[in-house]
C-alpha cells in the first residue's frame, strides 16, 4: 500500500549542541531547496549560426524553511527565541546560532542541515495566543531515512502541560502608556550573505544531487528590529494624529498572571504614524530600532 507524507502527521525537531527539542508547531510548516541552472549557447551541427540553449546544474541554492510556535507559559519553546536572537561566539566571531532541523512524517525523515533563522515575528494581538513565526535558510535539504530513522541528540523533556498565553498587551513610548491598543507585532530580521561556494574544479565533477555544490558558510550583516503598534483612534489620543519621531524609546511587553512574560525594551527608535479607516478608526505606529543592537538576547527577553 502506498504511504503518503502528510503535513498533519509531521513532527518538527531541532537539534542544537547535542540536544534535541520536539516542537509543537502550528500547521504552517514549510521547507524546500532549489538547484541553480546555468544555461549556455550551443551551436547545431548543420548550421553553426543557429544556437540552442544547453544547460548545466552543479549547485544548490540555500534551502528555505518556516514554522510557527505558540509561546506557552511553560516556555518549552524558548529554544526558538534563543536561536532567533542570540549570538554564537564560539569561533571568535559574531554569528547566529546554527542548528539542524528534522521533519518526520509517517513515511520519511527529512533533514535541513546548518539552519539559521533569518526572520522572526512575534504576533502580539490583544486577547489572542502569543505566536512566534520564524523563517530561515539552511545549507542542505535531504531525505535521510524513513519514519523510523533514529534522530540524533539527547531529547529534552517537555513539560507535562501546555498553557497558551492569552496576553495582556502593554506598550509604552517614551515612558508614556499607549492607550486603546488593538494589536502589535515585533519583528527581528537577521540579514545574512552566503559565501560564494562554486568552483570550476568542483563543478566539473558534479554528476548528481549527491555531489552537487551546496552553501557552506555565511556572514552576518546588519540586524533589524522593527514592528508596529495599532491603537483605536479616540478622544484620548487624536491629538497625536499623524506624528513621527526619530529618537523614541519603545517598550513592548505582554503580561501573564500579573507578571511580565515577553519584554522588548528598545532604546533609540524612529517611528511614523499612519491612519487606518475602517468601522472603527485606528492609527498605527511603524517603528524601527535605529541602531543594529549588540545583544538582542538581552533586549528581547522571554
Please give the residue ranges for each predicted region.
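Signature of extracytoplasmic/envelope-associated structural regions
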Residues: 1-302
Amino acid at each position: 500500500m502506498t504511504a503518503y507524507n502528510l503535513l498533519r502527521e509531521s513532527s518538527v525537531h531541532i537539534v542544537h549542541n547535542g540536544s534535541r527539542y520536539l516542537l509543537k508547531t502550528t500547521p504552517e510548516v514549510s521547507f524546500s531547496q532549489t538547484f541553480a541552472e546555468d544555461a549556455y549557447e550551443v551551436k547545431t551541427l548543420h548550421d553553426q549560426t543557429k544556437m540552442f540553449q544547453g544547460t548545466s546544474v552543479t549547485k544548490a541554492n540555500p534551502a528555505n524553511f518556516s514554522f510557527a510556535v505558540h509561546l506557552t507559559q511553560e516556555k518549552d519553546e524558548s529554544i526558538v527565541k534563543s536561536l532567533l536572537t542570540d549570538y554564537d561566539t564560539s569561533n571568535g566571531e559574531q554569528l547566529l546560532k546554527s542548528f539542524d532541523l528534522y521533519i518526520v512524517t509517517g513515511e520519511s525523515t527529512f533533514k535541513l542541515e546548518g539552519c539559521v533563522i533569518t526572520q522572526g515575528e512575534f504576533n502580539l494581538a490583544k486577547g489572542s495566543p502569543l505566536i512566534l513565526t520564524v523563517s530561515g535558510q539552511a545549507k542542505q535539504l535531504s531525505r535521510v531515512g524513513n519514519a523510523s530513522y533514529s534522530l540524533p541528540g539527547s531529547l529534552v523533556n517537555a513539560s507535562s502541560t501546555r498553557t497558551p498565553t492569552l496576553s495582556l498587551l502593554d506598550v509604552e513610548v517614551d515612558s508614556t502608556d499607549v492607550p486603546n491598543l488593538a494589536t502589535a507585532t515585533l519583528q527581528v530580521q537577521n540579514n545574512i550573505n552566503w559565501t560564494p561556494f562554486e568552483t570550476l574544479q568542483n563543478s566539473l565533477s558534479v554528476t548528481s544531487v549527491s555531489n552537487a555544490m551546496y552553501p557552506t558558510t555565511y556572514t552576518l550583516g546588519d540586524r533589524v528590529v522593527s514592528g508596529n503598534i495599532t491603537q483605536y483612534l479616540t478622544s484620548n489620543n487624536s491629538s497625536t494624529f499623524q506624528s513621527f519621531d526619530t529618537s523614541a524609546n519603545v517598550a513592548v511587553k505582554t503580561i501573564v498572571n500579573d507578571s511580565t512574560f515577553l519584554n522588548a525594551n528598545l532604546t533609540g527608535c524612529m517611528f511614523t504614524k499612519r491612519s487606518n479607516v475602517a468601522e472603527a478608526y485606528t492609527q498605527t505606529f511603524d517603528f524601527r530600532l535605529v541602531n543594529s543592537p549588540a545583544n538582542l538576547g538581552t533586549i528581547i527577553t522571554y
